């Protein structure tokens, strides 16, 4: 398009000098514009100038270019994971290993999660915890490389203690992402892992007491006999999907507590990242149940160019939202780690007001934040030259006025 209208028949022509002055004006405008562009320190400053009056999404408008108002990064290398207390031993093990630069981020995550598996952190990780209805402990785990974006996981793994180790074997010795159940156990044995009973005297006694109490509480709904007062065996009762209260028929009845997972992100001094999770799942679960822990993007997720996320909580709900994938993509859009965590939690709470969740997010610089709902969530981190691990307490989000 011409920068000025062409002269049409019947229109009055501008004087020749006027046309020349318009041309000169355009040339001068172009010269000054180019000078201004060259004076800008970067393209981002030009964009900021051009759109200074534009309205940005609130989570982005509050965050400067680096995603935080002031950096809380301890420096690299760094390890960060869900929960404090007994989980701090895992943080320390992974961090101390990373001080040797020959230890990769994947190595650190595997070591940290396996520490919790061996220590039976809080009874929610490793053998002898969270037995299912048949009194058996099964394990879920995953590990992810933030450079290749490849992950390996195991679900409902039976009779193998080192679930995170088997997950890494899936990553490194197959082109698959997940193996499950008895055949995952077979794979583990052929890769040198030892099959053994994961039941302990404590877990057996706990399950026996649960059965003596009428198998209460449990995760069954819409069955005969009434799962609210009886043990099985259960058969399904009719559910009318056309009824107005269909959604109500699918609600839980007050299931058992206990959804803790170790979910860890490691940042190597070189900037490479890895993430992983390990858990024995929900106590009294229906046999065969798989939680969010081994699901890439739900239990954890990492991209070395952006950051990583770890999650814990009610995995049956959380895996429907892929909160860690959402949080890392929010980092990519410019949110701070804390804002990204809060956004991921709010998306879940909007649909499930009572969901218990905890999200920890860290960007590639080591800046971190967390959010939770339904409980006070904690996360632990150690990095740079820190002499000890710090545990951060995160109160549940106040979302009462949002719904």
Q: How should these model regions be labeled?
A:
Residues 1-6, 16, 20-21, 26, ...:
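Generic low-complexity segments that are intrinsically disordered, proline-rich and/or Lys/Arg-biased
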Residues 60-403:
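Alpha/propeptide regions of enzymes that mature by internal proteolysis
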Residues 1-48:
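Classical eukaryotic N-terminal signal peptides for Sec-dependent ER targeting/secretion
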Residues 32-37, 47-73:
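N-terminal signal peptide
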């Amino acid at each position: 398009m011409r920068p000025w209208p062409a002269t049409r028949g019947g229109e009055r022509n501008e004087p020749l000098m006027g046309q020349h002055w318009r041309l000169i004006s355009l040339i001068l405008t172009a010269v000054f514009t180019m000078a201004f562009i060259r004076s800008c320190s970067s393209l981002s400053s030009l964009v900021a100038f051009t759109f200074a009056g534009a309205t940005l999404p609130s989570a982005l408008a509050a965050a400067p270019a680096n995603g935080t108002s002031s950096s809380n990064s301890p420096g690299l290398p760094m390890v960060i994971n869900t929960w404090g207390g007994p989980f701090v031993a895992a943080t320390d093990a992974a961090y101390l290993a990373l001080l040797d630069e020959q230890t990769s981020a994947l190595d650190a995550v595997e070591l940290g999660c396996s520490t919790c598996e061996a220590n039976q952190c809080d009874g929610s990780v490793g053998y002898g915890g969270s037995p299912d209805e048949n009194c058996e402990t099964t394990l879920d785990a995953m590990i992810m490389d933030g450079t290749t974006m490849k992950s390996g996981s195991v679900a409902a793994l039976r009779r193998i203690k080192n679930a995170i180790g088997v997950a890494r074997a899936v990553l490194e010795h197959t082109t698959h992402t997940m193996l499950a159940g008895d055949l995952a156990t077979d794979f583990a044995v052929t890769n040198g892992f030892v099959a053994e009973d994961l039941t302990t005297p404590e877990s057996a006694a706990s399950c026996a007491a649960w059965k003596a109490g009428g198998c209460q509480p449990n995760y069954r709904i819409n069955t005969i006999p009434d799962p609210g007062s009886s043990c099985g065996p259960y058969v399904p009762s009719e559910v009318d999907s056309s009824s107005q209260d269909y959604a109500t028929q699918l609600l839980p009845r007050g299931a058992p507590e206990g959804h803790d997972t170790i979910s860890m992100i490691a940042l190597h001094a070189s900037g490479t990242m890895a993430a992983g999770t390990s858990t024995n799942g929900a106590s009294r679960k229906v046999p065969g149940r798989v939680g969010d822990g081994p699901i890439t993007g739900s239990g954890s997720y990492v991209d070395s160019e952006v950051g990583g996320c770890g999650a814990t909580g009610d995995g049956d709900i959380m895996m429907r939202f892929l909160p860690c994938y959402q949080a890392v993509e929010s980092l990519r859009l410019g949110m701070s780690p804390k804002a990204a965590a809060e956004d991921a939690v709010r998306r879940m709470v909007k649909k499930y007001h009572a969901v218990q969740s905890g999200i920890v997010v860290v960007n590639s610089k080591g800046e971190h934040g967390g959010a939770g709902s339904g409980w006070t969530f904690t996360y632990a981190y150690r990095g740079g030259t820190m002499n000890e691990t710090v545990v951060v307490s995160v109160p549940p989000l106040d979302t009462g006025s949002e719904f």
